[in-house]
């Protein structure tokens, strides 16, 4: 992504999945299974799931993945998933995040934590996340936009990725780990 091509560039919020798995293991040292609820039509979720499974395989952790098509599928899928795993981990799946309260309610029923993929999910009830700074990402994006507006060739600008991530913990949910 050093030179994406015709008038194309941007920024990326790639998840640090290795750090996320390390966080889950630190908070739940005995974790044996992690549930993933994802939307089958979101390419980002499919890619994250593949990478997450590879990391968990190395750690001896089973990933139980449940695909949904839309919001109407989430209540039953979240309930079923929560009944089978030690915790649930969210990606930046738009459909799932927009229905986070449903996932949290299912997890509450089985007294398991939900880990988020960014700080806002933790604010909304997830136990913890290794989160990138979306304000910093926005600033980098804005700086790139200014460069394009000043005449720089967007197609020659590499895509920039924010890689610094910070653990964020919801102290009111800490007992759930």
Residue ranges and their predicted role:
Residues 67-81:
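Structural motif
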Residues 10-56, 158-173:
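An alpha-beta-alpha
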Residues 177:
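Conserved small/polar residues in nucleotide/adenosyl-binding loops
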Residues 120-172:
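Flexible loop/turn connectors
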Residues 7-8, 55-71:
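Short beta-strand elements in bilobed, periplasmic/extracellular small-molecule ligand-binding domains
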Residues 1, 103-127:
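Venus flytrap/periplasmic-binding-protein-like
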Residues 34-37, 85-97, 115-117:
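Periplasmic-binding protein-like
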Residues 2-33, 132-152:
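Hydrophobic alpha-helical segments within soluble ligand-binding/sensing domains
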């Amino acid at each position: 992504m050093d030179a994406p091509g015709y008038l194309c560039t941007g920024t990326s919020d790639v998840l640090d999945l290795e750090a996320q798995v390390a966080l889950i293991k630190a908070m739940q040292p005995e974790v044996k299974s992690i549930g993933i609820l994802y939307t089958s039509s979101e390419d980002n979720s499919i890619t994250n799931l593949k990478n997450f499974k590879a990391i968990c395989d190395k750690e001896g952790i089973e990933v139980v993945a449940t695909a949904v098509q839309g919001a109407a599928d989430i209540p039953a899928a979240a309930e079923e998933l929560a009944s089978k795993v030690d915790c649930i981990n969210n990606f930046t799946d738009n459909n799932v995040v927009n229905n986070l309260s449903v996932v949290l309610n299912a997890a509450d029923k089985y007294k398991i934590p939900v880990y988020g993929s960014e700080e806002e999910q933790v604010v909304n009830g997830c136990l913890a996340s290794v989160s990138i700074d979306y304000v910093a990402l926005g600033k980098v994006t804005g700086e790139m936009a200014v460069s394009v507006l000043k005449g720089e060739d967007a197609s020659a600008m590499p895509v920039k990725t924010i890689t610094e991530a910070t653990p964020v913990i919801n102290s009111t949910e800490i007992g759930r780990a």
